[in-house]
């Protein structure tokens, strides 16, 4: 939803050695123009709960394994359906600044749409529509805050009946959210209070 975006083709890569985390490279995608959601069913007894995972990457790339599939592996191992959202991170500053408290209005549109789709098709995926939450890391944590405070009205034109469903998360877990402060002139080591 939300109009046509024209930028370069989607790409993927591995981090260079200096960008390793815990001694390992991480897989990232960039220039994402078409959002996708991948549903991972629980590996053990289904609790009915579902969690949408928003990987981080500064609204420029998405850390698909470190802050995505690895999280889904854990969630599904404890009976939770995991939905990995590959939200739009198109190349260009126009898409990394905008209203609605997010650096990327396209990402918020994708988050709103995903929650509506999950509620609309909850029976198909064996999800309790009142137990759908979100978790995100860094920019994804920022997206958690954005969807948690921008759920009353869609920021795109309705596509189908899924957009009549609530896009309000039942619980939200922002992990080291980025982009939360408007004024970066304050040094992080100082306590402003």
Which stretches of residues belong to each language-model region?
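Short beta-strand-to-loop junctions in surface cap/lid or active-site-entrance loops
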Residues: 1-2, 27-30, 37-47, 123-125
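N-terminal targeting or regulatory segments adjacent to alpha/beta-hydrolase or S9 domains
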Residues: 1-30
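Short beta-strand element of the alpha/beta-hydrolase
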Residues: 47-56
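Serine-hydrolase catalytic-loop signature spanning alpha/beta hydrolases and amidase-signature enzymes
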Residues: 58-61, 82
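Catalytic nucleophile-loop/oxyanion-hole region of alpha/beta-hydrolase
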Residues: 63-64, 70, 87-128
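Short amphipathic alpha-helix adjacent to the substrate-entry channel of hydrolases
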Residues: 65-84
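Active-site loop/turn elements of alpha/beta-hydrolase fold enzymes
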Residues: 80, 87-89, 177
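Primarily recognizes the serine-hydrolase "nucleophile elbow" in alpha/beta-hydrolase
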Residues: 106-192
